[in-house]
Every structure is written in structure tokens, then in C-alpha cells.
């Protein structure tokens, strides 16, 4: 479930800084010209019980209207794909990616609905999170519902100065437990192959 909310928040932060500024100034909707986004990421997870943080690497891709791919490459490869309303998850076993049945479709449908709101520029029209703007580059999400708060106590996303693309995500999961993701090699509105969203 946590990776679904992380996935949502990454896509939520895609729109440009002009839309962010408009939302901070009064919640007005902004016209977005987003067609696609790709980036690499490094995820570092800190837990009190661990002597060293857990480090994972991967990539994500998004294409309008609702095609998304979230892929962990190391230490264990897994792929989450959402395309045309369908959700598929693959996990590597014995060197091959195998599809996992029974993915959490209910949660994923909620995520897709939230993504649509954000891509339409509705930054503050959010039923699940209280959204606050720390500065012109940082947005903080505080869960409204206890069900979500039990998993995530708070999230901060930081937008880069160039093109308004995502720089990092900080997920606060409890005392001495947090996850930070840093993004690189970001590209926007490039032509993406259809196969990215149809299979592993």
C-alpha cells in the first residue's frame, strides 16, 4: 500500500512550478501541457531496527491520460503498471518477471482518481490529504484519514527550479522511520514506447 501512495505522490508532483504557484496563491486551477514524464530514482529507507538503511534503485514513467509504470531495478526487480484502467504487478523470481494476481485494485483505483485531480491542476481539492505549501518549492501532505495516517504520518515533496520537475520525496512513517527518494535523469514530454505500459 505504501508504494501506491508514493507512486501517487510522485505523479502528483509532476506539474510545473507555475501550477504550484497558482495553487499556493489561492487554489486556482492551472492549465497543464504535460504529455509524459520519465525519471530514475534512488530510494533510501531508514528504520530504527536497521544498522544501515535499505537502498533501492529504479525508474518511473508516466504518459497521459492514465498510463503509469513504476519499476524497482535493485535489489529486487518488480514492476507496477497501470494502463487503460487495468492494473498489473510483476515480481522477479528465478530470473523471470512473473505476474502477481490479486493486486490491490481498490487502492489503485483511488490513486488513479487522485492523479487525475492533480494533473488537472487541482492542488488543494484533496479529500485524503491536507496540503500546505512550505515555500515555492516544497509541498507538505498530512493525511486526513486514520487509515492512511497509520501508514504515513507526513510527506514532503520538493520541486526543482528547472521545469518544475520533482527533486525528492520524504515520507515520514513513524518515530525514526522514514524514506527519502531522490530523482535524476528527468525528462518531460518525450515520446514513450507503448510497450512500457503493456508488459514488463
What label would you give each PLM region?
Residues 123-200:
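Gly/Pro-enriched, hydrophobic low-complexity segments
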Residues 22-47, 51-53, 86, 91-147:
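Flexible, processing/modification-adjacent segments and terminal tails
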Residues 51-59, 82, 156, 177:
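Amphipathic hydrophobic-ligand
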Residues 35-43, 56-60, 66-70:
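One face of beta-strands
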Residues 5-15:
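Bacterial N-terminal signal peptides
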Residues 59-111, 179:
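An acidic-aromatic
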Residues 15-21:
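Sec/Tat signal peptide C-region and signal peptidase I cleavage site
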Amino acid at each position: 500500500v505504501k508504494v501506491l501512495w508514493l507512486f501517487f505522490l510522485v505523479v502528483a508532483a509532476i506539474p510545473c512550478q507555475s501550477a504550484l504557484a497558482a495553487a499556493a496563491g489561492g487554489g486556482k486551477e492551472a492549465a497543464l501541457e504535460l504529455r509524459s514524464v520519465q525519471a530514475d530514482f534512488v530510494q533510501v529507507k531508514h528504520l530504527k531496527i536497521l544498522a544501515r538503511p535499505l537502498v533501492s534503485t529504479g525508474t518511473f514513467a508516466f504518459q497521459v491520460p492514465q498510463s503509469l509504470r513504476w519499476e524497482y531495478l535493485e535489489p529486487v526487480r518488480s514492476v507496477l503498471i497501470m494502463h487503460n484502467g487495468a492494473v498489473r504487478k510483476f515480481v522477479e523470481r528465478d530470473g523471470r518477471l512473473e505476474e502477481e494476481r490479486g493486486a490491490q485494485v481498490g487502492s489503485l483505483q483511488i490513486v488513479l482518481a487522485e492523479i487525475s485531480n492533480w494533473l488537472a491542476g487541482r492542488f488543494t481539492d484533496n479529500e485524503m490529504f491536507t496540503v500546505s505549501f512550505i515555500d515555492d518549492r516544497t509541498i507538505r501532505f498530512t493525511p486526513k484519514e486514520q487509515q492512511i495516517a497509520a501508514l504515513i504520518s507526513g510527506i514532503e515533496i520538493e520541486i526543482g527550479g528547472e521545469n518544475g520537475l520533482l527533486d525528492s520525496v520524504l515520507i515520514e512513517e513513524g518515530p525514526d522511520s522514514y524514506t527519502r527518494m531522490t530523482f535524476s535523469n528527468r525528462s518531460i514530454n518525450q515520446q514513450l514506447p507503448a510497450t512500457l505500459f503493456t508488459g514488463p
